[in-house]
Amino acid sequence: MERYENLFAQLNDRREGAFVPFVTLGDPGIEQSLKIIDTLIDAGADALELGVPFSDPLADGPTIQNANLRAFAAGVTPAQCFEMLALIREKHPTIPIGLLMYANLVFNNGIDAFYARCEQVGVDSVLVADVPVEESAPFRQAALRHNIAPIFICPPNADDDLLRQVASYGRGYTYLLSRSGVTGAENRGALPLHHLIEKLKEYHAAPALQGFGISSPEQVSAAVRAGAAGAISGSAIVKIIEKNLASPEQMLAELRSFVSAMKAASRA
């Protein structure tokens, strides 16, 4: 959890926002996935948001569903994902690492055992996409026992009660939805969200990172101007992977230039 605090303090001092890419672990295979993650970090990613392959990702659009399918086709298991996480942490000791999960995968070996394993491999936060705030007690309690930040989604239509709950229960960062629906670069995030960001700050919530439909540098700078602490981009990154499956080196080169441009926009 401290890695997020340190990151946001440093970015604050430099007057810049965070750029956080999302990819699915093991897409399109373990070896290339590790190279992708190294490339994202080298190109300027401030933190990572990583998915563990899941057969029925409800919140995700077709791009990220296909990433899950590619990882499954490569035979990637949750156990291998944790081995990958340990390698990533060993190589990159300071970068915050967040997982985006679905409840079934957390339940699989018991909630506490899941968060204990996260702590062991150096994960900083977990967002369980299909568990609403009001059902989150066993997850967030286990998370805090193991020094893992529980992350909550703040939707664009959040009422005051939900804003207060998200502020009270969340740690690390707050996942601010640009809009409702499923993820995807086609559905571009609609700004501004000033009022939500102001309210979250008023209730002392963890810093807000805006996600869903973030696919251009302009959207990153707009999120930062609206008061968000940064932006998360998933589908746009995964599309670059999908487009270059036949040419791994070209894939890494395109990822590098995309992330560099997105990070540069966080300094605007």
UniProtKB/Swiss-Prot annotation:
Pathway: Amino-acid biosynthesis; L-tryptophan biosynthesis; L-tryptophan from chorismate: step 5/5. Disulfide bonds: none annotated. One of its GO terms (cellular component) is cytosol. The keyword Lyase applies. It catalyses: (1S,2R)-1-C-(indol-3-yl)glycerol 3-phosphate + L-serine = D-glyceraldehyde 3-phosphate + L-tryptophan + H2O. Its EC number is 4.2.1.20. Keywords: Amino-acid biosynthesis, Aromatic amino acid biosynthesis, Lyase, Tryptophan biosynthesis. GO terms for molecular function: tryptophan synthase activity. InterPro entries: Aldolase_TIM, RibuloseP-bd_barrel, Trp_synthase_alpha_AS, Trp_synthase_suA. Pfam families: Trp_syntA (PF00290). The active site is at residues 49, 60. The alpha subunit is responsible for the aldol cleavage of indoleglycerol phosphate to indole and glyceraldehyde 3-phosphate. HAMAP family: Trp_synth_alpha. Tetramer of two alpha and two beta chains. Belongs to the TrpA family. This is Tryptophan synthase alpha chain.
